[in-house]
Amino acid sequence: MDKMKDLLEMMEASKDDLPEIYCDMDQVLCNFIGRAEEVIGMPFAKFGKDDRWIKIRDTKDFWANLDWMPGAKRLYSFIQKYDTHILSAYSDRDDNSRPGKKKWLKKNTNIKPRNINLVKRADKQKYATTDGKPNVLIDDYKKNIV
């Protein structure tokens, strides 16, 4: 029995040594582009930036009702065991972005509210370390990945 206790104590100690996991939402958990293309009626990149954001902003509950990305439920089922954090950029072009993303998370995940970080894209780098230890960021945007 002492060996089992030792093993469990070692597992707890190693849990404390794990990096924080930060997961993005758009194009990682949620299919932002797919829904945006439905709303604007054409490929996202081919529609003018201002015009596409007007359409997104004018779509009721756009953010709260995004579909899961293919494979994202499987990813989430794995990472949610590790007190995962959300690190997602909000849109300055749509005031509904932050509250809508929070609604999506509440409806689709069990992420603790204190672990939800909706920030400006440039601020994501501030989450690279915690107390000098490197963290893990799951993100689709290459500029956010080292």
Segments predicted by a language model, with ranges:
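Short hydrophobic segments within beta-strands
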Residues: D24, L87-A89, I138
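Active-site neighborhood of HAD-like aspartate-dependent phosphohydrolases
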Residues: K3-D61
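A general structural motif
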Residues: D16-L18, K81-D83, P113, G132-P134
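Short catalytic/ligand-binding loop motif for oxyanion handling, primarily in non-cytosolic enzymes
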Residues: L29-I33, E38, T84, R93-S97, ...
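Short, acidic loop-to-helix structural element flanking the phosphoryl-transfer center
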Residues: F47-G48, R57-I86, D94-P99
